[in-house]
Amino acid sequence: MNQKQVIAERLAAILPSLEVEAIYNLLEKPKSSEMGDIAFPAFSLAKVERKAPQAIAADIVEKLDTTGFENVVATGPYVNFFLDKAAISHQVLTDVITEKDQYGKLNIGQGRNVTIDMSSPNIAKPFSVGHLRSTVIGDALANIHEKLGYKPIRINHLGDWGKQFGMLIVAYKLWGDKAAVEADPISELLKLYVRINAEAEEKPELDDEARQWFKKLEDGDPEAHELWQWFRDESLVEFNRIYDKLDVTFDSYNGEAFYNDKMDEGIQILEEKGLLQESKGAKIVDLESYNLPPALIMKTDGATLYITRDMATAMYRKRTYDFVKSIYVVGQEQINHFKQLKAVLKEMDFDWSDDMTHITFGLVTKDKKKLSTRKGNIILLEPTLDEAISRALTQIEAKNPDLENKEEVAHAVGVGAVKFYDLKTDRDNGYDFDLEAMVSFEGETGPYVQYAYARIQSILRKANFVPNAENDYKLADTESWEIIKHIQNFSAVVERAGDKFDPSLIAKYAINLAQAFNKYYAHTRILDESPERDSRLALAYATGLVLKEALRLLGVKAPEKM
């Protein structure tokens, strides 16, 4: 049990006017470590007790069961708790050594399913750094939920349907070269896509033609379907090569096209419930009671829309996976779409729509400018990852020229640097893509955390340290205590990251733990013979294990040597 919980329960036993949870939420960290580790402010009791907060604090100290604490004192209106550092450090180090990579695991999910809609690139368009966020945030959220006891189901809802295929078919029929497309599919298809969009601005009839071709595709026209299948197959080969490089896997690649024959059920339910209304020849669901614009379900030409397909998708996923959470990792520009989707499902009496959560994220820019596939202003992800690996290799060769498997380590560091930089950013904030900053071994970066882990492994190898849970490891000095508190807090950080759907909490935790250890290492001679040597090595071991696990949750590898 964490110490705040112990304090809250002890205080609740003598403060009948406050519940344990309320007390827990009032507990805070004193301004200085000299004033203790945890403080309870007595202000909130002044009205009820009709006493000055200072007097209440003194009364609490007199009545409280202080067993297991180094000291408990009243300082003005605060009750300050000094924790038993030796006892807690022993418990924390023993727990980490016993539980290993299971340390911090919780069983909140009890094995229940969580679907995570993530990555979802558009077929026939290049995989750019713009797709990186949904991919790595989704993967990290899957890892975090697994650590919390859920069963994550990673779904790559491919953008393999829509008007853009009408545009692409028109472009290919006008200017396409089969041999050129087969030689370099994505690059050639991108050129066609950019060209058709540019020309359509001058010639609106191209838009009409694209719409007609997409309608043909929906109706099963053989020529349209053959071209669509070809675009899809060629794109997936390239996407899977990039996913392998990122070390990201999926449980399902069911994209938009998969739901072509699954939309009638949702439309039928809307009709049966009298929710479908005619509006200028189109069919809509009125959402005025939700303060939302009407949801357009079917256009005048009978073509379906994203929301129709997403209704079918949600219904299929609930039926197939019986999720307790359905997470959609999709950019901020889709906020209204997901609000409408949930509202329509709610109107259909699907209460499980409350379990659907849209996880937004900010934009990636380059030189502060927005990236756009349509305008051809993008940064391709694969060559960017290769450049990150190359930069990592250059730095590794400078630091450790004799390192074995340099290429493998450079891959882990380069790819990890790009992923970590993305994930350390507050989810709803965007960031400017800066490869030099990402791959730096200094500052708040992935390589900095990886290097701290590798340094710890080097210390443990030199000492031939073998952890033993039976040993009486304990430390009571201030420097060690800072690290112990970080390690003890790991499961709480994982839980909060899951609650807030925010992997940046794990990334920041890893940075703080690495910084705390590096500071400790600079001031403490860990390998020197002393009564604390084994306990210090146990602390290094525990720090390394938790750093590695934090990085794993972010989808980042931790090399043993750098």
Swiss-Prot record:
It holds the Pfam family tRNA-synt_1d. GO terms for cellular component: cytoplasm. It is an enzyme of class 6 (ligase). The keyword Manganese does not apply. Its EC number is 6.1.1.19. A motif ('HIGH' region) lies at residues 121-131. One of its GO terms (biological process) is arginyl-tRNA aminoacylation. The keyword Transmembrane does not apply. InterPro entries: Arg-tRNA-ligase, Arg-tRNA-synth_N, Arg-tRNA-synth_N_sf, ArgRS_core, DALR_anticod-bd, Rossmann-like_a/b/a_fold, tRNAsynth_Ia_anticodon-bd. One of its GO terms (molecular function) is ATP binding. It catalyses: tRNA(Arg) + L-arginine + ATP = L-arginyl-tRNA(Arg) + AMP + diphosphate. Keywords: Aminoacyl-tRNA synthetase, ATP-binding, Cytoplasm, Ligase, Nucleotide-binding, Protein biosynthesis. It is found in: Cytoplasm. NCBIfam families: argS (TIGR00456). Monomer. Belongs to the class-I aminoacyl-tRNA synthetase family. This is Arginine--tRNA ligase. It comes from Streptococcus suis (strain 05ZYH33). The gene is argS.
